[in-house]
């Protein structure tokens, strides 16, 4: 998941080679990596559960909507202080990650029913 999150964050920031990194603030890169990690984690944790009650096309559509929700929510509400205290070597144990995944799943249940 971490490698996928890094790749997606670099793509989202239009970083195609190492030279591009000098134009991106470290906190911006870390925030993007964290957001992508949470998006991938949500899909990893819940895709199979969602797919049990829905067809593959609907599952993909719902996961795309949740990706957008997670991205918007974290871009608007994730604070630099939250990122500075995180151990990026153990993201799965992070309170920010746990809380974000729990909140996203609650929103999913509210709008789309139990997975």
Language model: regions and residue ranges:
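Short alpha-helix boundary/capping elements
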Residues: 6-14, 34-42, 46, 70, ...
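Long amphipathic alpha-helical segments with strong coiled-coil/leucine-zipper propensity
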Residues: 1-34
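Short runs of predominantly hydrophobic/aromatic residues within well-ordered alpha helices
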Residues: 2, 26-35, 39, 63, ...
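Alpha-helical oligomerization segments
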Residues: 44, 48-115
